A protein has these predicted regions:
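Short glycine-rich anion-binding loops that position phosphate/pyrophosphate groups of nucleotides
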Residues: 81-84, 106-108, 153
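Hydrophobic anchor at the beta1->P-loop junction of P-loop NTPases
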Residues: 7
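Post-Walker A helix-loop "phosphate-sensing" segment adjacent to the P-loop in P-loop NTPases
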Residues: 24-35
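P-loop (Walker A) phosphate-binding loop of NTP-binding proteins
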Residues: 10
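NTP-dependent small-molecule kinase module
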Residues: 2, 17, 21, 25, ...
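ATP-dependent small-molecule kinase phosphotransfer cores
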Residues: 33-92, 139
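A glycine- and Lys/Arg-enriched "phosphate-lid" helix/loop adjacent to the NTP-binding pocket
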Residues: 96-137
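Conserved glycine(s) of the Walker
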Residues: 14
Length: 168
């Protein structure tokens, strides 16, 4: 097995949960970009947004992604933040640093989860989430090597593992 298995997708799409299942199945480490960013600055992402704004958070996120894509041992699983694909620089970094899987979870399914609560960019409700989805979908598609359709954690994990194992 080789390289980094990188997960992208909307906030609350299951990147960390599915990443953990993949890491267990592959017996490799999981690196959660949002958790590492929080650990680095010593406060939560909502606190960073409230105190410093989205631009400051995106700069921190970029530094975290650079570290994960250059300093982590491979193989590993990396769960990115939902906005990791917002800049061309980040998309290029992710694509050249591993195999990128887009967890394409529909808005209705994201809204139905408890873990959507407390996420700064999901605070605007369903209309805001649909607008965010419309903007980000083309960016996820441009960054991903593979699109992963929605399903249970096990279904999505197994789908990714089949693709991962078949990729040269």
């Amino acid at each position: 097995m080789r390289g980094r298995l990188i997960l992208i997708g909307m906030p609350a799409s299951g990147k960390t949960t599915i990443g953990a299942a993949l890491a267990r199945a592959l017996s490799v480490p999981l690196y959660d970009a949002d958790a590492l960013t929080e650990q680095t600055v010593g406060c939560s992402i909502p606190e960073i947004f409230a105190a410093e704004g989205e631009a400051a958070f995106r700069a921190l996120e970029r530094r975290t992604l650079e570290a994960l894509c250059t300093e982590t041992e491979t193989p590993c699983v990396i769960a990115t933040g939902g906005g990791a694909v917002l800049t061309e620089q980040n998309r290029e970094l992710l694509r050249r640093s591993g195999t990128v899987f887009w967890l394409d979870r529909p808005v209705d399914n994201i809204m139905s989860t408890d873990y959507a609560a407390g996420r700064p960019l999901l605070a605007g409700g369903e209309a805001a989430l649909r607008a965010l989805y419309a903007v980000r979908c083309p960016l996820y598609a441009a960054c991903a090597h593979y699109r992963v359709p929605d399903g249970t954690v096990d279904q999505m994990k197994d789908y990714i593992l089949r693709l991962w194992r078949d990729t040269p």
